[in-house]
């Protein structure tokens, strides 16, 4: 594929970032309680899939190429979402002379940090389980889809880093509020509408928490109102609506989104589906018999594993199995369901869904893994 630039113009930054990444990986792992063997394995696994993604983009094209070209031109106004990624990338391209491959290694590290927080959360959920359940939980940390879609130049690596931080923060939100706030800010930069859901879910979980004092709940409710007033115009502008839009305008926007990304071999017609079917389609398709490429086939195997987890998880939920670890579960469930409704009802392209759903799946995976199996030890509190 003709690119119009040399993706290997330099690779000195790549070598430097690779070494710095290892050092930072070990330091972060120590802080969040992951052993060096696991963190190193994840690091090399993640960067391996980064290079797979890199060469795939060189051969087949992708958003990363457009981000790089726009960053070189450096004439995009400051804004959220795509504009933020372009301006952020432009600094490294135009001032530090990063090449295309250098940027992949940089964004790969952002995604890897998200994987570390995700892994730390999963380990906390499964460490009191019997061996088969622990192995099943570790499988999700090394799912190819997790590292593949979070290893490239683009919004997904930053969004997943924010997701991982929010999940880790929810395990002990009283002492990690700063991490949740940071995750909301990072998500705001790349996906403002999801950041809004993240924020509202967290505040609602505190308001509805009976353990939180009445005055604190009133305070958090006031904060939620103020933040909503400030953020809604930003989100409305970001998604392309106008202030004062009514129900019909929102409905038209959803219809437009359903057809906007309904092109290509991985597109499906979701306009005639019920909302529950849209949600199931978003989470679990493509299935193996629907795969149109090797990457879709690999993703379909991941989806089979996710289906197995959901079946096991809800079986143990109906058995009233207690979670293996304390966490702000209301926050996690609220964020998962609200985000799923928004994303599932506006995404008709399975290729886009395969990437974007990793902003919400870590929450579901943690919630279900924490209840499956028979716990060998008492429920543990995270300090």
PLM regions: where:
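Transmembrane-helix motifs of polytopic, lipid-linked glycan transferases
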Residues: 22-28, 105-127, 308-312
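Extracytoplasmic catalytic/substrate-binding loops of multi-pass membrane glycan-assembly enzymes
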Residues: 56-70, 76-91, 97-98, 275, ...
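Short acidic/glycine- and proline-prone juxtamembrane loop motifs at membrane-interface regions
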Residues: 151-155
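Membrane-interface alpha helices of multi-pass inner-membrane proteins
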Residues: 147-148, 164-170, 178-203
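Extracytoplasmic loop-helix module adjacent to an early transmembrane segment
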Residues: 35-79, 247-250
């Amino acid at each position: 594929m003709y690119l119009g630039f040399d993706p290997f113009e330099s690779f000195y930054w790549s070598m430097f970032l690779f070494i710095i990444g290892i050092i930072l990986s070990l330091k972060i792992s120590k802080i969040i309680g992951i052993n060096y063997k696991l963190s190193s394995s994840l690091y090399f696994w993640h960067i391996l899939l980064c290079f797979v993604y890199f060469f795939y983009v060189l051969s087949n094209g992708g958003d990363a190429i457009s981000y790089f070209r726009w960053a070189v031109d450096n004439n995009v106004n400051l804004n959220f979402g795509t504009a933020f990624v372009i301006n952020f990338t432009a600094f490294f391209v135009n001032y530090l002379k990063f090449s295309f491959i250098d940027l992949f290694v940089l964004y790969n590290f952002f995604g890897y940090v998200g994987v570390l927080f995700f892994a730390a959360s999963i380990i906390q959920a499964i460490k009191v389980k019997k061996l088969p359940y622990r192995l099943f939980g570790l499988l999700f940390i090394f799912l190819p889809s997790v590292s593949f879609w979070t290893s490239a130049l683009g919004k997904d690596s930053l969004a997943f880093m924010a997701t991982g931080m929010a999940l880790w923060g929810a395990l002990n939100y009283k002492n990690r509020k700063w991490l949740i706030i940071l995750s909301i800010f990072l998500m705001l930069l790349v996906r403002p509408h999801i950041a809004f859901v993240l924020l509202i879910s967290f505040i609602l979980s505190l308001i509805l928490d009976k353990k939180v004092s009445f005055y604190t709940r009133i305070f958090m409710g006031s904060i939620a109102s103020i933040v909503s007033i400030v953020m809604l115009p930003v989100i409305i502008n970001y998604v392309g609506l106008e202030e004062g839009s009514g129900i019909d305008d929102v409905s038209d926007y959803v219809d437009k989104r359903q057809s906007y990304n309904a092109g290509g071999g991985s597109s499906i017609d979701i306009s005639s589906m019920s909302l529950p079917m849209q949600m199931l389609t978003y989470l679990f398709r493509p299935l193996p018999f629907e795969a149109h490429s090797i990457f879709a086939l690999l993703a379909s195997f991941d989806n089979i594993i996710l289906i197995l987890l959901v079946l096991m998880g809800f079986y143990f939920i109906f058995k009233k199995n207690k979670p293996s670890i304390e966490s702000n579960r209301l926050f996690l469930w609220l964020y998962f369901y609200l985000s799923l409704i928004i994303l599932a009802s506006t995404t008709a392209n399975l290729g886009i869904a395969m990437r974007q759903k990793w902003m919400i799946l870590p929450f579901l995976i943690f919630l279900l893994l924490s209840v499956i199996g028979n716990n060998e030890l008492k429920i543990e509190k995270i300090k």
